[in-house]
Amino acid sequence: MPRRLILSATERDTLLALPESQDDLIRYYTFNDSDLSLIRQRRGDANRLGFAVQLCLLRYPGYALGTDSELPEPVILWVAKQVQAEPASWAKYGERDVTRREHAQELRTYLQLAPFGLSDLPALVRELTELAQQTDNGLLLAGQALESLRQKRPILPALSVIDRACSEAIARANRRVYRALVEPLTDSHRAKLDELLKLKAGSSITWLTWLRQAPLKPNSRHMLEHIERLKTFQLVDLPEGLGRHIHQNRLLKLAREGGQMTPKDLGKFEPQRRYATLAAVVLESTATVIDELVDLHDRILVKLFSGAKHKHQQQFQKQGKAMNDKVRLYSRIGQALLEAKESGSDPYAAIEAVIPWDEFTESVSEAELLARPEGFDHLHLVGENFATLRRYTPALLEVLEPRAAPAAQGVLAAVQTLREMNADNLRKVPADAPTAFIKPRWKPLVITPEGLDRKFYEICALSELKNALRSGDIWVKGSRQFRDFDDYLLPAEKFAALKREQALPLAINPNSDQYLEERLQLLDEQLATVTRLAKDNELPDAILTESGLKITPLDAAVPDRAQALIDQTSQLLPRIKITELLMDVDDWTGFSRHFTHLKDGAEAKDRTLLLSAILGDAINLGLTKMAESSPGLTYAKLSWLQAWHIRDETYSAALAELVNHQYRHAFAAHWGDGTTSSSDGQRFRAGGRGESTGHVNPKYGSEPGRLFYTHISDQYAPFSTRVVNVGVRDSTYVLDGLLYHESDLRIEEHYTDTAGFTDHVFALMHLLGFRFAPRIRDLGETKLYVPQGVQAYPTLRPLIGGTLNIKHVRAHWDDILRLASSIKQGTVTASLMLRKFGSYPRQNGLAVALRELGRIERTLFILDWLQSVELRRRVHAGLNKGEARNSLARAVFFNRLGEIRDRSFEQQRYRASGLNLVTAAIVLWNTVYLERATQGLVEAGKPVDGELLQFLSPLGWEHINLTGDYVWRQSRRLEDGKFRPLRMPGKP
């Protein structure tokens, strides 16, 4: 059986692709004086040009010119220009094969190159094995191999040799990974791992299948079941630190492979691979279960507290009429008493003139019942659901292993007290139980004259545990999401080395004194400028008075002439089925090749099957209904393909392919240069089985839902999407989309609405090199912060909220740099850190320092906003693109009433990724045909004003059929370079 190739044909072409852009040609193919002197020794244009081209190829990519080599025209033109030869002479070069070979030999001597021999292969494999222990991506390994060989200056071998070296390196790395996971295991460990492949008692599924099931709902019953899963994993008792020295990418991939395989398939593996795979599954699944347990506990508490608050409000509303009646009655009585005092008459008679004395006495008793204590709130109602918590919290506290920072030691001590009480079946809280963690609003309920109230002591401790887990003051052993704060950051030694070498990956001056001096000087200048403009009433389209700030709304940005062009071009776009559109776009871009097999990296063999699975995600139809709507497909086929070919990383790579094509398309330049972007959240209601996984945000009503948070470039390409809880502020995820997309976009300026900004985001955006420009609602209520106090800027008094605490920034400067560097290098995601900062119940030093830094940037931005109408227009236009994209997404995601009905978070992510990929495909297809439509208008004698092209949008879908049977007609495929005919005006 022949060895499976690591590299696909497309990847081979990519690796040896020649530079074509002007920048790359200058970088790789610019001759020095010595080169030109050697080249000029050739006689005739053909020989000079051919010799020079061979010199270029031997330098980069590093291979010799073949007899059948086809070179891009830009290469020939660039080389010919430098050697002053006619480009047409290239066709004559090499008519004598001897000449070509003689030139190649002379150049090898000149460049001091040697051919790559078989004796060089072992060293290359050893070098690649180190990288293969981090990733088994063939393209990355081959790219590293070529780069390494270029530095050593041999002539590159055939790619089949590179492929062989990569394959051997992956095999060696796999054996090392297996060995690292299996050697520490005892016979007892292996026996327990084998047990996981057996049927669970009284069930038709194996232990491993049951253990990997996600909890269905946030309630005590499913919580207890999930706790049992964690206990089962803990019984396996893998050696401490197992897998710690294996790169997380490889460990996660091995665990995913094991998770997708049937127990029968796993049982067929040779022992070392089987035990290594099972160990990886147990390690990853244990961390997942711990994270899910903490999340479930959080959601149950949030649900109980929300229910108590709602009940409290309902009770208050019911009593509102009675309270109002009493207030009106006592107002009349009070007025009668005032009049009686003035007249000197009997006050008791005055009361009885308003209400009989017996009724007055009764009303006083009723008022006492209606009255509430001074600190009255909904907390006392939470106690009504104490039984719900008691069903699972003893077991939860038993299986979790929390650790605490000094600030949360009191909470940890309270948790330990609860564990001891549960173990000893104590009903009363010990008198010496820790109480320092109890907040003032809890004290009246917890600390009573009879002692510590058991019910409210436990609820308070569990609530504070939830808060401390969110902020990171408490972490859990074995968790991924709830780790020690310091573990998320770059190691202190590595950060110190980067700073010492001036290699921090940040966009600012790392010297705190110089940085702060520059920013504060700029802030002073901007404050002075805006003060002068405001005082002279010269702020553009804005007025600042003692009563506040007023900004004139922007006028319509689309002229009537542009609307006429929009209508004309939209009528010309060909009508097309969504299936044919996806096939067209895949023919242009090859995005489907990125959906590689999880195990061997092979491309999907059946393109229509793959596109059906993607479309099933995008239109919210699901695999079952998709199989019914697509002739020749079955659920089993689609399910298998999704399990092995569709993952977050394959969706991300395919999306990057589409975004890059949009970025490079000439017509897209009319909308922007790819350096600005916007982001916005789009809520989808959670229904059916997905309802229990949804979150509630009062902003969207009382129904649960999910938010798809999407970033879109100024060229309309949606380059990132995330599924997030509707209860989390949009600003948490703004940076993730900018930092972790895989496209070639280089975003410099980013726009959001009000929900997309916080001071922490302003700070991190600036540190990481992005200009942040949110459209802030009620801007006059968003305060400025100044260096010298409000008295220095009397004109701006209505806008000033306080003085900057620069001392705090200086004190935590290194912590700020370390945090930002960690986010930039991917050690931790920005969203995780921002969630933790948003959860701090106290004034954490780093959080406060970052906030102060953000206040500087926010103040500078607002001052810029007040001075620049152009900035306001730019932000407004960018956000409008995102809102228009949301309309397209809503139209595509039409099945199941547009509701999220998938129970697992993984499936919900696939829905969002599929939707984003298909909308990106629609954008690219529309861009191509909008260009053809404008060309068609010109050819028809209807000139198009180039200034109006910026107002066209590739987000229309009226011409796209999204419904019906999903038939993939290979016969409708267009030939290379061919396009569908435009519609004739006036025809459907």
From Swiss-Prot:
Specify the domain of life of the species encoding this protein: Bacteria
- List keywords of the entry alphabetically: DNA recombination, DNA-binding, Transposable element, Transposition
Listed transmembrane segments: none
Gene Ontology molecular-function annotations: DNA binding; transposase activity
Among Pfam families, the record links this protein to: DDE_Tnp_Tn3, DUF4158
GO annotation terms (biological process): DNA transposition
Start and end residues of each stretch annotated as Disordered:
678-697
The protein's matches in InterPro entries, at most eight in alphabetical order, are given as: DUF4158 (IPR025296), Tn3-like_transpos (IPR047653), Tn3_Tnp_DDE_dom (IPR002513)
Q: Keyword DNA-binding, does the record have it?
A: yes
Please state which protein family the record places this protein in.
Answer: Belongs to the transposase 7 family.
Q: What does this protein do?
A: Required for transposition of transposon Tn1721.
Name used for this protein in its record:
Transposase for transposon Tn1721
Q: Which organism is it from?
A: Escherichia coli
Q: Which gene encodes it?
A: tnpA
